[in-house]
Every structure is written in C-alpha cells, then in structure tokens.
C-alpha cells in the first residue's frame, strides 16, 4: 500500500511500516500543500493512506467518496509514538477508503517549571 506521511509526522516512524511504500510530503515537495490540496495531491498520486497529526482535518475535510483513508495521530511526539508503534501499524492496516482511523496516545504528565522530579 502507498502511504503518505504529512509534514507533521516524525519520519523515524517509517521503519515500522517497512512492508509498505511510504513517502513524506517533504520528500515529494508537498510540504507547503495544506489540507484539501494535500489530500487531492496524495489521491491523484495513488496513495491509499495519509498519516497526519493534524487532528482538525476530521472537521475540515469530508472524505466521503474519496479513495484515500486518513490515519490521525493524537500527538507527533516521537518519544510517545515509538513506545507503541503497533498502534500506528494496526490503524494503517484497518484504514478503509474514505474513512478515518484515530490513534490515541497517552502523554506523560507535564512537569511544573523548576521541578526536577
């Protein structure tokens, strides 16, 4: 399957999807494309899934009738994402044409300024 990583997705995650043809928006010169334009370009280029950390896309874009699926990550913090790469893999595998898959990650609690612990 052809998968596109949006510019806000850390590229080290590529290794967890090695069985797929994964490209990044930056690699393709699409870093300045946003929302609908990026989805349209991805679809026209034959991508089946786009992975993004832009949680607002669900409300901005209607995928009904599109051939592209969207996998939305709840964070783009690589330290958090790499603790559970299986969640990304499962979401990509479950992605259906014209649909959304949401991948939730728990963030560590924020430390108060000046606290060492």
Which residues make up each language-model segment?
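N-terminal first-folded block
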Residues: 1-48
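Short loop/helix-cap segments at secondary-structure boundaries that form the rim of catalytic
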Residues: 13-19, 57-66
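Glycine-/small-residue-rich active-site loops that bind phosphorylated ligands and cofactors
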Residues: 30, 58, 76-80
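Small, basic N-terminal interaction modules of short regulatory proteins
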Residues: 115
